[in-house]
Amino acid sequence: MAALIAFLTRMWTLFTRYNTFFAEGIKNTLIIAFFSVLLGTVFGTLMAMLRMSKVKPLRYLATAYIDFIRGTPLMVQLMFIFYGLPMTGIKLPDISWIPNFSRFAAGIVAMSMNSCAYVAEIIRSGIQAVDHGQTEAARSLGFRQSQTMTMVVLPQAVKNILPALGNEFVTVIKESSIVSVIGIADLMFRSKDVIAVTYISLETLAIAAILYFIMLSLIHISEPTRLRR
């Protein structure tokens, strides 16, 4: 018991002394996760439409992209974006008044590309879960295909899609810790900074784990409210 109390005391001391480190890490983690899911949702929706397209080349292209992204490690994708693109002559954007913008851009692009593949399957599954009879009924009433999709299918599919998108956001937050390898000051990166200064690793990692848990718990708690709306 005494050892546990001492451990918790060291954790609290570390947290109060280096709370600005952890706060910056949380901020950057949420920024990366938010934009990754936002862009992933936008392009994932487009990819889902291509995946269900009647035009075979587009459908095959979307299927190949989704299978490739889901079948390769996120680390490889991140390294290719950050290190590989500049080697091919494609420079990442950089803004002088935003520190490390190119690193953030690489992290968000890689995370968005990865999320896009999973979101595409979430949306496709949500749409296909709607009974096909709904589509046939709408078409028999004279609805165009676009009207059928926007006015009949999507409103019903959203109920299937939103919970899965919430889970995707949770997954992106957890996977975003990988961007620390390219120098983005997310929560994991800042935790490593604290370890480098204090040489106290276990307590610091425990703090990081608790902070991740709190962030994800808040998202889970907010989901029922969002779905009711």
Kindly give the residue locations of the regions a language model identified:
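Conserved protein kinase catalytic core
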Residues: R229
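Transmembrane alpha-helices and adjacent helix-loop boundaries
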Residues: M1-S222, R226
